[in-house]
Amino acid sequence: MSEDSNPKNDLKLKMYETFRSHIERAENSFWTYMLFYLQFLVGINGAVGILCRYLSNNLQNFPTEIIIAFLALVNILLSLIGIIVIIERGKWFFRNMILTVNLERYILKEEHIKIIPKRYSKFDNFNKVIDTTGRIFISIFIGIYMISVIALGYLANSCKTIILFGTGFFIIVVIIYFLDLLDWIYRRIDSNEYRKVIGVVLFISFIPPLMNYFIYDIINLICSYIPESFIVAMIVILIFVIIDVYYNAKKHIENTIIMLSLERTVNDIDDIIKILKNIRLDDTKKEELKKKLRKIKKLIENVIKLLGGTSENGTQNNNLEEAKSKITEACRKISGNNIFEAINELNEAKYIINNKINELTQSDSS
C-alpha cells in the first residue's frame, strides 16, 4: 500500500481540513458578531440621545442628566465586555494556531502552502495574541469607554451624580466578580456554553429595570444620610478593587502565554526525538537540530522571565533551569554523536516541562 493511500495519513488529512474550515468559519462568524455588537451599541446611544432631546423639549423636569449618566454606565459595561470577549477570542485562536502548526508539521511538506506562515509572519512572537482587527475593535471600545467616563465626570457636579458615578462602577465590579464566579462554578459541573450565556444574560437583564425604577430614590436616600467623606472613601475602595481585577486579568493572560509557550516547547522536543530515532545524522542535520534546541532554550528563558524571581515561583524557576540545562547537555551529546544519551536528556527535560504545565493547569483551575 502506498503512502498516499495510507488510512492513517488519510485520517490526518481529513482532520486537518475539518480543523482548518472550523477555524475560518469561527473567525468570520466572530467578527460579524462583533460588528453587529458595535452597531447595536452605537444605535442605542443614537436612539436614546434623540429621544432625550425630544422629551426634554416637550416635558418639564425631565431627568436628562440621570438618563445620560445611566447610558454612560451601560456604555462602560458593554465596552468592557467587548474588550474581554476579543481578548478571549485572541487566546482561543492563538491556541488553534499552535494546533494547526503541529498538524501541518506532520502532514504537509516544506513546499506546500501552509495556513499559519501565510497569515502570520512572526509566529514565534507569543505575545502577539491580538491581531490587527482585534486592535481596531479594542481601540473603538476604549474610545467609547473614555467618552462615557468623560461624560460622567462632566455630570459629577452634585452629590447625586457623584454617588451615581460610584454606584455604577460598583455595579460593574460586582458584575465582573459575578462572571468570574459563574465561570468557576460552570467549570466544575457538566454543562455547556449556552447555559452559561443564558445565566449571564438573565443576570444583566435585571440591572436596567432596577436602575430605571429605584436608582433615583436610592440616590436621594443616600444623600440624606451619608456624608461626602464616606462617599470619597467608597470611591477609593472601588479603585483598589478595580486594580485588583486588572491584576488578576493580567496574571491570567501571562499564565496563558506561559502555557502556550511550554506546550510549544514539548511539541518541538517530541519532533527532535523522532528525528533522532529515525534519521541518520550528518553534520548539517546536527547543526539544524542544535539550532532548534537553542530556540527552545530561548523560549524557556522567556518563560522564566514571565514567572519572575519571587519566592512563590522560585522552585518552579529552578525546575525550568534544570530543563534548560538538560537541553544544553543534549546539544553536547548530539555533537559527540551520543544519540541515545541525547534522547534521554530530552525526555527528562520534557518530563520536567510537562510537570510544570500540570502545575499551571491546577493553579489556574483553582
UniProtKB/Swiss-Prot annotation:
It is found in: Cell membrane. One of its GO terms (cellular component) is plasma membrane. The chain crosses the membrane at residues 30-50, 66-86, 136-156, 162-182, 198-218, 225-245. Keywords: Cell membrane, Membrane, Transmembrane, Transmembrane helix. Coiled coil: none annotated. It comes from the Archaea. It is a multi-pass membrane protein. This is Uncharacterized protein MJ0976. It comes from Methanocaldococcus jannaschii (strain ATCC 43067 / DSM 2661 / JAL-1 / JCM 10045 / NBRC 100440) (Methanococcus jannaschii).
